[in-house]
Amino acid sequence: MVGLGIMGAPIVQRLCDKGYDLTVWNLEPDYYDRVKDSGAQWAASPAEVWTASDIVLVCVLGDDAIENVCLGKSGFASAGKAAKLLIDLSTTSPEATLKLASRLKDETGARWLDAPISGGPKPARDGELTVMVGGDSAVFKEAEPLLRKIGQNVTHMGDLGFGQKTKIINQAIVGANYILMAEMLATCRAAGIDPDLLPVCLKGGLADSAILQRIYTQMSAEDFDPPRSYVRQVNKDLKSVTHFVDDLGLDLPLMDVAIRQYHRYADAGNEMEDGASVSRLYQTTDAPK
């Protein structure tokens, strides 16, 4: 595994519990403390992870980061030819996926699956993630037993890049709902409704959702420490949504408004706050415009 962040570390712990021998690397070496007790072995570089492993999982922050671990100094390609399988759990652009998969195959012979994940740290630790996979169907079948150790819902969405396309749509739904939950929390408070009763009342109805039960509840309790996700990550993903939609020639005004609101919160110096803390935008007397 390369990447021991909010999602990478619990995935390592989960796979070690399931009997896998893992070699790991992270840009900040002190992150190894998160998984040391699980039995994972530290490597000095991505190249060392590549050399030591049959399957390499990557869970890093965006296009630049995955390009660096693949093609940068001491990256995977520097380790030379090897018939490896790379599974990219990161949220990256479909364009970067196609470009890097082609380059890495040319330089090392490696196969590639884009398999971005959704669910959060606890589902990652418990093996209950949602995994959306793009790539060759035979390669997917080879990797599926491993992916099902970390995901309760693993779906092959199509060719290489289709996992990332699906994740962009996932993030659009999540990001828009962050704003909707924040606005409905503010509405409950303004109307004198006990905000904690809303998810109880709506449970099982058409308005119920995982986001209502988890994210809205987190917002209502102002339970943002430690972060379960970072504003910078959600904001980055929503920028990807904008590019994706623009490239398709679509006009989605509801999505545009939600994205602008989230950008506004991120740009106010909140990038390292919990992603759900965007509800703080609405803790003023004047609703944001």
Task: Name the predicted role of every residue range.
Residues 162-286:
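Helical "substrate-binding/catalytic lid" subdomain
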Residues 92-171:
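Rossmann-fold dinucleotide-binding core
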Residues 6, 10, 48, 55-57, ...:
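Amphipathic alpha-helical hairpins
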